[in-house]
């Protein structure tokens, strides 16, 4: 019996090692499918233009981002522009739809998603140095089709579930769990229509919204994604006059 236990323990440990290796292998295949780490790292800025259709309203979207974690998005509806931005240390926004036409610093909870989005390469690249943990959870289904499932636990405690196409190894769905003040917020993002930009594959079609309410999801269609274009770091920073009124922005 003792020998049998040792044999079973040996195979159990081997299976755990293989499980861990599979997560690394899938991440490697995903990055290779996108164009390879060298080409990914060769992109330093991005500019996008897109159309958003949320059913009851439509909007024009644009964004600029710069390595490693500068990000700004603009949402235009009926001539009014909402802004959300992160300068690497502070997140801020302009919300004219809520009657706030002056830039305002964002709180920790409301800025979490924006800061995650500002990660230029995403959580799979340099995961360990970012404090992210990646696990392989086996196979799962996305709209009836098979997919590899990865669990990504971010440094801040939020969890992402990546679903990879078994043929292309590109992500086709990402589920997000945000843990805020004792509650869990769940959302889902569907990705498709991948096209190369400077040798790196990007999704030109996205559908995003609450996980359990498909009718509330918004569809985003990218008209243009440009890489290594000139951007101004000043665009990511909260305007000086506002920052002076908010010492915590420094």
Describe these PLM feature segments.
Residues 9, 41, 127-129, 201, ...:
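A generic structural signal for short, non-catalytic loop/turn and secondary-structure boundary residues
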Residues 45, 131-133, 219:
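A residue-level signal for beta-strand positions that form part of recognition/binding surfaces
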Residues 19-32, 39, 92-158, 178-185, ...:
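Flexible, processing/modification-adjacent segments and terminal tails
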Residues 7-18:
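Bacterial N-terminal signal peptides
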Residues 63-70, 87-90, 109-110, 165-168, ...:
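A short, sequence-level motif marking secondary-structure junctions
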Residues 80, 145-237:
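Gly/Pro-enriched, hydrophobic low-complexity segments
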Residues 24-99, 135-138:
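N-terminal mature ectodomain segment of secretory-pathway/periplasmic proteins
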Residues 1-6:
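Positively charged n-region of N-terminal signal peptides that target proteins for export
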